[in-house]
């Protein structure tokens, strides 16, 4: 299975270990970054993961940032993504089996890597259990999506990156 994997600078080390875990399970990893510890913006990498999944380049996606909240919010803005921020097996399985989640998000500073890998493995192996009720619910959620032409622009975040380069942002 092809898994898109993205993170921010805070958890690059965690992402690399998750990548190795996925490869050891026979999955192909599409690593969309970030690749080092240089400060960056998590929405960039949430967007990249979501685009890989929605385009069909990846079967599923995994997003990781410090708490998981920011990158998961960002990936959920990509039309067609259904991502769940999880910290336990029950939530991850519910997201996949009942809501047909195609991305899973984690707080790399919140949850341990071993548990994260166990949850990812279970999420990948779980199957959506379609019912009339959950199909209707998913359709309602999809109806809430807003698509903007700017989202497809590869320079969508350039304004923020330029401000960072000029020293206008600080952690």
UniProtKB/Swiss-Prot annotation:
Catalytic reactions of this protein: aldehydo-D-galactose 6-phosphate = keto-D-tagatose 6-phosphate
GO molecular function, one term: ribose-5-phosphate isomerase activity
EC identifiers of the protein: 5.3.1.26
One Pfam short name: LacAB_rpiB
Keywords assigned: Isomerase, Lactose metabolism
Pathway: Carbohydrate metabolism; D-galactose 6-phosphate degradation; D-tagatose 6-phosphate from D-galactose 6-phosphate: step 1/1
InterPro entries assigned: LacB, RpiB_LacA_LacB, RpiB_LacA_LacB_sf
A biological process term (GO) from this entry: galactose catabolic process
HAMAP family the record matches: LacB
NCBIfam families: lacB, PRK05571.1, PRK08622.1, PRK12615.1, rpiB_lacA_lacB
Record's subunit section: Heteromultimeric protein consisting of LacA and LacB.
Family: Belongs to the LacAB/RpiB family.
Protein name, as recorded: Galactose-6-phosphate isomerase subunit LacB
Gene transcribed to yield this protein: lacB
């Amino acid at each position: 299975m092809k898994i898109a994997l993205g993170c921010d600078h805070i958890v690059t080390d965690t992402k690399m270990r998750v990548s190795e875990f996925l490869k050891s399970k026979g999955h192909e990893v599409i690593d969309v970054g970030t690749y080092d510890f240089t400060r960056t913006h998590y929405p960039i990498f949430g967007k990249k993961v979501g685009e890989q999944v929605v385009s069909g380049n990846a079967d599923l996606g995994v997003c990781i940032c410090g708490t998981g909240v920011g990158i998961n919010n960002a990936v959920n803005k990509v039309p067609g993504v259904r991502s769940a921020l999880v910290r336990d097996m029950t939530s991850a399985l519910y997201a996949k089996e009942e809501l047909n989640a195609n991305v899973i998000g984690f707080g790399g500073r919140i949850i341990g890597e071993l548990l994260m890998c166990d949850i990812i493995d279970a999420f990948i192996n779980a199957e959506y259990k379609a019912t009339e009720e959950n199909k209707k619910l998913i359709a309602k959620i999809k109806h809430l999506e807003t698509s903007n032409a700017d989202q497809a622009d590869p320079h969508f975040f350039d304004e923020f990156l330029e401000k960072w380069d000029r020293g206008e942002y600080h952690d």
